[in-house]
Swiss-Prot record:
Organism: Rhodopseudomonas palustris (strain BisA53)
Localization, UniProt: Cell inner membrane
Protein name: NADH-quinone oxidoreductase subunit I 2
Assigned keywords, A-Z: 4Fe-4S, Cell inner membrane, Cell membrane, Iron, Iron-sulfur, Membrane, Metal-binding, NAD, Quinone, Repeat, Translocase, Ubiquinone
NCBIfam families: NuoI, PRK05888.1-4, PRK05888.1-5
Residues bound to [4Fe-4S] cluster 2: C72, C102, C105, C108
InterPro entries tied to this protein: 4Fe4S_Fe-S-bd, 4Fe4S_Fe_S_CS, NADH_quinone_OxRdtase_chainI
Amino acid sequence: MGVTTAARSLLLTEFVSAFFLAMRYFFKPKPTLNYPFEKGPISPRFRGEHALRRYPNGEERCIACKLCEAVCPAQAITIEAGPRRNDGTRRTERYDIDMVKCIYCGLCQEACPVDAIVEGPNFEFATETREELYYDKAKLLANGDRWEREIAKHMALDAPYR
Protein backbone atom coordinates (compact mmCIF):
# COMPACT_ATOMS: atom_id res chain seq x y z
CA MET A 1 0.00 0.00 0.00
CA GLY A 2 2.78 2.41 0.83
CA VAL A 3 4.59 1.70 -2.45
CA THR A 4 1.55 2.46 -4.65
CA THR A 5 0.84 5.69 -2.79
CA ALA A 6 4.46 6.75 -3.17
CA ALA A 7 4.43 5.86 -6.88
CA ARG A 8 1.23 7.85 -7.45
CA SER A 9 2.58 10.92 -5.71
CA LEU A 10 5.96 10.62 -7.45
CA LEU A 11 4.44 10.19 -10.93
CA LEU A 12 1.78 12.86 -10.26
CA THR A 13 -1.02 10.72 -11.74
CA GLU A 14 -3.79 12.86 -10.25
CA PHE A 15 -2.18 15.99 -11.67
CA VAL A 16 -1.80 14.48 -15.13
CA SER A 17 -5.37 13.13 -15.21
CA ALA A 18 -6.71 16.51 -14.06
CA PHE A 19 -4.62 18.26 -16.71
CA PHE A 20 -6.04 16.07 -19.49
CA LEU A 21 -9.55 16.57 -18.16
CA ALA A 22 -9.04 20.34 -18.28
CA MET A 23 -7.64 20.14 -21.82
CA ARG A 24 -10.63 18.10 -22.96
CA TYR A 25 -13.02 20.86 -21.83
CA PHE A 26 -10.72 23.63 -23.02
CA PHE A 27 -11.15 22.67 -26.67
CA LYS A 28 -14.93 22.02 -26.53
CA PRO A 29 -17.26 24.77 -27.78
CA LYS A 30 -18.25 27.18 -25.01
CA PRO A 31 -21.88 27.03 -23.78
CA THR A 32 -21.76 30.66 -22.62
CA LEU A 33 -23.55 33.28 -24.73
CA ASN A 34 -22.18 36.76 -25.23
CA TYR A 35 -25.52 38.17 -24.05
CA PRO A 36 -26.12 41.55 -25.55
CA PHE A 37 -24.96 40.33 -28.94
CA GLU A 38 -26.21 36.72 -28.80
CA LYS A 39 -29.58 35.67 -27.43
CA GLY A 40 -30.59 32.18 -26.42
CA PRO A 41 -33.86 30.49 -27.31
CA ILE A 42 -37.00 31.55 -25.41
CA SER A 43 -39.64 29.08 -24.28
CA PRO A 44 -43.08 29.39 -25.93
CA ARG A 45 -44.46 29.86 -22.41
CA PHE A 46 -42.15 32.75 -21.57
CA ARG A 47 -43.94 35.69 -19.94
CA GLY A 48 -42.47 39.00 -21.00
CA GLU A 49 -43.78 42.42 -21.94
CA HIS A 50 -47.55 42.69 -22.39
CA ALA A 51 -49.14 43.25 -25.78
CA LEU A 52 -52.65 43.70 -27.16
CA ARG A 53 -53.30 41.74 -30.34
CA ARG A 54 -55.35 42.55 -33.41
CA TYR A 55 -57.33 40.37 -35.80
CA PRO A 56 -55.83 39.89 -39.28
CA ASN A 57 -58.22 42.56 -40.61
CA GLY A 58 -56.65 45.13 -38.24
CA GLU A 59 -59.46 45.33 -35.68
CA GLU A 60 -58.38 45.03 -32.06
CA ARG A 61 -59.30 41.76 -30.38
CA CYS A 62 -60.26 43.09 -26.94
CA ILE A 63 -64.03 42.90 -26.40
CA ALA A 64 -63.96 44.82 -23.08
CA CYS A 65 -65.15 41.85 -21.01
CA LYS A 66 -62.86 42.99 -18.17
CA LEU A 67 -61.98 39.43 -17.15
CA CYS A 68 -58.27 40.27 -17.14
CA GLU A 69 -58.91 43.24 -14.87
CA ALA A 70 -60.95 41.08 -12.48
CA VAL A 71 -58.45 38.22 -12.33
CA CYS A 72 -55.29 40.34 -11.92
CA PRO A 73 -53.98 39.67 -8.38
CA ALA A 74 -51.81 42.81 -8.43
CA GLN A 75 -54.67 45.03 -9.69
CA ALA A 76 -52.35 46.36 -12.37
CA ILE A 77 -54.94 46.49 -15.18
CA THR A 78 -57.49 49.29 -15.67
CA ILE A 79 -60.11 49.08 -18.41
CA GLU A 80 -62.85 51.49 -19.47
CA ALA A 81 -65.31 50.10 -21.98
CA GLY A 82 -66.79 52.24 -24.69
CA PRO A 83 -70.48 52.28 -25.61
CA ARG A 84 -71.94 49.36 -27.53
CA ARG A 85 -71.65 49.62 -31.29
CA ASN A 86 -74.51 49.16 -33.73
CA ASP A 87 -73.52 45.52 -34.22
CA GLY A 88 -73.68 44.89 -30.43
CA THR A 89 -69.95 44.62 -29.80
CA ARG A 90 -67.90 46.68 -27.37
CA ARG A 91 -64.33 47.91 -27.50
CA THR A 92 -62.14 49.53 -24.91
CA GLU A 93 -61.65 53.26 -24.69
CA ARG A 94 -58.93 52.91 -22.10
CA TYR A 95 -56.70 49.90 -21.42
CA ASP A 96 -53.87 50.62 -19.01
CA ILE A 97 -51.36 48.28 -17.38
CA ASP A 98 -49.11 49.42 -14.57
CA MET A 99 -46.02 47.33 -15.29
CA VAL A 100 -44.54 48.36 -11.93
CA LYS A 101 -47.36 46.51 -10.15
CA CYS A 102 -47.48 43.55 -12.57
CA ILE A 103 -46.13 40.26 -11.23
CA TYR A 104 -46.10 38.53 -14.65
CA CYS A 105 -48.27 35.66 -13.45
CA GLY A 106 -50.03 35.23 -16.81
CA LEU A 107 -53.55 35.08 -15.36
CA CYS A 108 -54.70 37.92 -17.62
CA GLN A 109 -53.60 35.94 -20.66
CA GLU A 110 -55.33 32.77 -19.43
CA ALA A 111 -58.58 34.62 -18.63
CA CYS A 112 -58.90 36.34 -22.00
CA PRO A 113 -61.53 34.55 -24.13
CA VAL A 114 -60.27 36.02 -27.43
CA ASP A 115 -56.47 35.96 -26.81
CA ALA A 116 -56.35 39.76 -26.89
CA ILE A 117 -53.90 40.34 -24.03
CA VAL A 118 -50.74 38.27 -24.12
CA GLU A 119 -47.35 38.34 -22.51
CA GLY A 120 -44.94 38.49 -25.41
CA PRO A 121 -41.35 37.39 -25.94
CA ASN A 122 -39.75 40.76 -25.17
CA PHE A 123 -37.81 40.91 -21.92
CA GLU A 124 -35.67 43.94 -22.69
CA PHE A 125 -37.88 46.83 -21.69
CA ALA A 126 -35.88 48.56 -19.00
CA THR A 127 -36.59 52.26 -18.61
CA GLU A 128 -35.05 55.24 -16.89
CA THR A 129 -38.28 56.51 -15.32
CA ARG A 130 -41.29 54.86 -13.70
CA GLU A 131 -43.71 56.73 -15.93
CA GLU A 132 -42.47 54.80 -18.95
CA LEU A 133 -43.70 51.59 -17.30
CA TYR A 134 -47.34 52.75 -17.35
CA TYR A 135 -48.59 51.24 -20.60
CA ASP A 136 -51.65 52.67 -22.30
CA LYS A 137 -53.70 51.12 -25.07
CA ALA A 138 -51.60 52.65 -27.86
CA LYS A 139 -48.36 51.28 -26.39
CA LEU A 140 -49.91 47.82 -25.89
CA LEU A 141 -51.26 47.73 -29.45
CA ALA A 142 -47.86 48.85 -30.77
CA ASN A 143 -46.23 45.98 -28.84
CA GLY A 144 -48.75 43.58 -30.33
CA ASP A 145 -48.06 44.81 -33.85
CA ARG A 146 -44.31 44.60 -33.29
CA TRP A 147 -44.26 41.07 -31.83
CA GLU A 148 -47.31 39.50 -33.55
CA ARG A 149 -45.34 37.00 -35.61
CA GLU A 150 -43.46 35.60 -32.62
CA ILE A 151 -46.54 35.72 -30.38
CA ALA A 152 -48.59 33.76 -32.93
CA LYS A 153 -45.79 31.20 -33.30
CA HIS A 154 -45.48 30.74 -29.52
CA MET A 155 -49.25 30.46 -29.10
CA ALA A 156 -49.42 27.82 -31.84
CA LEU A 157 -46.68 25.80 -30.12
CA ASP A 158 -48.46 26.09 -26.77
CA ALA A 159 -51.95 25.37 -28.18
CA PRO A 160 -52.01 21.63 -27.35
CA TYR A 161 -51.53 22.44 -23.68
CA ARG A 162 -54.20 25.13 -23.35
